[in-house]
Amino acid sequence: MGVPLTPIIKRKVISLSDLRGRTLAVDANNVLYQFLALIRKPDGSPLTDSEGRVTSHLVGLLFRTTRLMSEYGTRLAFVFDGKPPRLKRAELEKRREVRAKALAQWKEAKASGDYATAFSKAVASSKLSLQMSEDAKRLLSLLGVPQIQAPSDAEAQAALMVARGDAWAVASQDYDSLLYGAPRLVRYVTLTGREFLPSKGESKRLLRELIDLQSVLDGLNLSRESLVDLALLVGTDFNDGVLGVGPKTALKFMRQYGSIEAIPSNVLPRPPGDLDSLRKAFLDPEVVRDYRLEFGDMDEEGVVSFLCKEREFSPQRVDEAVKRLKSVRARRSALTKWMDSSGQKPRPFR
């Protein structure tokens, strides 16, 4: 879910052309959940093959990522979640309960023919299984798209990659990567049209956004440490926050007092959890530093075999996606040869 900072975060609306030639560290689980939530039949049922294996996420990966790569030259590196942090277990249990309730409501609405309600409940019931995740990794490998396995939270790993200059921005809908220190965050990169909000039962138009961490900190007159404290007051995936304290109130507290400890006890009777552990989760997260970011060649036969023979995709549509990626490889190869012959240096993708 991520920390709800929208009311106080300065965002810049961008277009996909603004990401031309950039390398993005993609929060894989976040993106796959969105594909699973939105790529569905009118009654809310996910796309599946004849054996009942879900393919919605593979559809999203194949067609939306290849479009970004072919039309805009954007390089994508997918970062997958590892073992959930201990502090996140309570939040994950809440999510399981919400999904279970939504699943029951979806089945009831679908049985009654109320497809509008069924779709909304189906979105909230989305679950990314281990098999789905492994299928996604397999497809990405066949496409030559790199994956990095984070030891814990993918957004922390992606933030490190951007901070080190190996990627230009983190791609995720959540703001957590800012708390982890990502210099830049882009939202809604892989989605088009409208986003459905299950909690409100409505949808909103998707506008791609760029958030610059330093601009956010300067605009709020906060340090990154104070921004983390602000988030802890509001509530994160690691803690519940303080009842009645939203982003604007938390910002007021941080500007006035500077830290949670400095807030008077008559204003804040008790802190929102173990502050040392919570701060460490964001300021010193578990990451791997010896990752490899390598963009490989596409295994065309492997892509066709996996998607068409095993998962029963339309050969025509798969062929279209494959041709798009082949055109990207051809253009890059031609550019590299020209650069080599002319002594020019290519622009860094990050």
Question: Where does each model-flagged region fall?
Answer:
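Residue-level signature of catalytic and energy-coupling elements of molecular machines
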Residues: 27, 78, 174, 246, ...
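Noncatalytic, basic helical substrate-engagement surface that gates or grips nucleic-acid strands
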Residues: 2-14, 18-164, 191
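Non-catalytic nucleic-acid-binding/docking modules located in mid-to-C-terminal regions
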Residues: 3, 9, 13-20, 201-350
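Aromatic side chains
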Residues: 33-35, 80, 106, 175, ...
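Nuclease catalytic cores that cleave nucleic-acid phosphodiester bonds
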Residues: 45-46, 125-275
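Solvent-exposed, flexible loop/coil residues
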Residues: 13, 23, 43, 91, ...
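Short, structured coil/loop segments at alpha-helix boundaries
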Residues: 85-87, 93, 111-117, 121-126, ...
